[in-house]
C-alpha cells in the first residue's frame, strides 16, 4: 500500500471506540492474571541488583490525522486507544516520532506507542523506541490491520514476516531484518468485488462492523493484559480459546 501523506498528526477521539471504551473501563483483569501478580513482584525483586524489569512495548500502527480516523487501516491505533482508556494511561508524550504513554498492568510496566510517521514509515519510530529503551524484541507487540483475516478476527503470532503489510515491513527493516517480535493481527476482511485494497483500507466501518470490532477490541485488551502478566503463550491460548468458543456459540 502506498504511503499516505498530508494529514495532521493530532489525536482526535474516535466515535467508533465509545462502546469498546465503556466496556473496557468495567472489564476486570483476568483472574489468572491477578494470581500472577505475586510472581511478577517476585521477578521484580529478583531484578533488584541494580537492574529493572523492561517494559512491554505495545505498538499500534496507523496513519495520523482526522481524515484517517475510524478507517480500517487504523485499527492498530484504535486498539492502543482502548488499552490506554482501560488502564488509565495518557499518550501525552511525543518521543521518537510517536505518541507515547507509560503505565502498568498490575505490576508489569508497559509502554504504549502510536507512530506518527504514517504507516509505511512506522519502523523509523519503532526502531528508535526499541533501541533507546533497550526493550527485548520478544516484549514488543505490534498491532495492525490484516486483509487476509476475516473481519474482527484476531491472530496472535510470536514472530514472522511482513505478509505484504508495509508498516510491518518498515519495522523489520529498521530492526536490521530481525523478525522475532510478536504481532497481533486484526482482521479487516477482503475488499468487495474488484475494489483496490489501497482504497478499501481507507474506508470507514458501518454500524454492524463497528459492533463486531468492539468485541475484537475487548478480546485484544484481555490478550494484552494476560501477555503483560503471564507471557505470550498464555495470551495466545486465550485468543485461540475465546475465538473458538465464539464460533461454537453462533
From Swiss-Prot:
Pfam families: Pept_tRNA_hydro. GO terms for molecular function: peptidyl-tRNA hydrolase activity; tRNA binding. Keywords: Hydrolase, Mitochondrion, RNA-binding, Transit peptide, tRNA-binding. It catalyses: an N-acyl-L-alpha-aminoacyl-tRNA + H2O = an N-acyl-L-amino acid + a tRNA + H(+). TRNA binds at residues 68, 118, 120, 166. NCBIfam families: pth. The natural substrate for this enzyme may be peptidyl-tRNAs which drop off the ribosome during protein synthesis. This is Peptidyl-tRNA hydrolase, mitochondrial.
Amino acid at each position: 500500500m502506498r504511503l499516505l501523506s498530508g494529514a495532521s498528526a493530532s489525536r482526535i477521539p474516535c466515535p467508533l471506540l465509545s462502546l469498546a471504551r465503556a466496556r473496557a473501563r468495567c472489564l476486570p483483569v483476568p483472574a489468572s492474571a491477578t494470581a500472577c501478580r505475586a510472581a511478577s513482584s517476585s521477578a521484580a525483586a529478583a531484578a533488584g541488583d541494580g537492574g529493572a524489569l523492561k517494559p512491554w512495548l505495545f505498538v499500534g500502527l496507523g496513519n495520523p490525522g482526522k481524515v484517517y480516523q475510524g478507517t480500517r487501516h487504523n485499527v492498530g491505533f484504535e486498539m492502543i486507544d482502548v488499552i490506554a482508556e482501560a488502564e488509565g494511561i495518557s499518550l501525552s508524550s511525543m518521543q521518537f516520532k510517536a505518541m507515547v504513554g507509560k503505565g502498568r498492568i498490575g505490576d508489569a510496566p508497559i509502554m504504549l506507542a502510536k507512530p506518527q510517521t504514517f504507516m509505511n514509515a512506522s519502523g523509523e519510530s519503532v526502531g528508535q523506541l526499541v533501541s533507546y529503551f533497550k526493550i527485548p524484541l520478544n516484549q514488543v507487540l505490534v498491532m495492525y490491520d490484516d486483509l487476509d483475516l476475516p473481519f474482527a478476527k484476531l491472530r496472535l503470532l510470536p514472530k514472522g514476516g511482513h505478509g505484504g503489510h508495509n508498516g510491518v515491513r518498515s519495522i523489520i527493516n529498521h530492526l536490521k531484518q530481525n523478525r522475532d517480535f510478536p504481532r497481533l493481527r486484526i482482521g479487516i476482511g477482503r475488499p468487495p468485488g474488484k475494489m483496490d485494497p489501497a482504497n478499501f483500507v481507507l474506508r470507514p466501518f458501518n454500524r454492524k462492523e463497528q459492533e463486531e470490532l468492539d468485541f475484537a477490541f475487548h478480546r485484544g485488551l484481555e490478550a494484552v493484559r494476560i501477555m503483560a502478566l503471564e507471557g505470550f503463550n498464555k495470551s495466545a491460548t486465550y485468543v485461540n480459546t475465546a475465538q473458538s468458543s465464539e464460533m461454537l456459540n453462533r
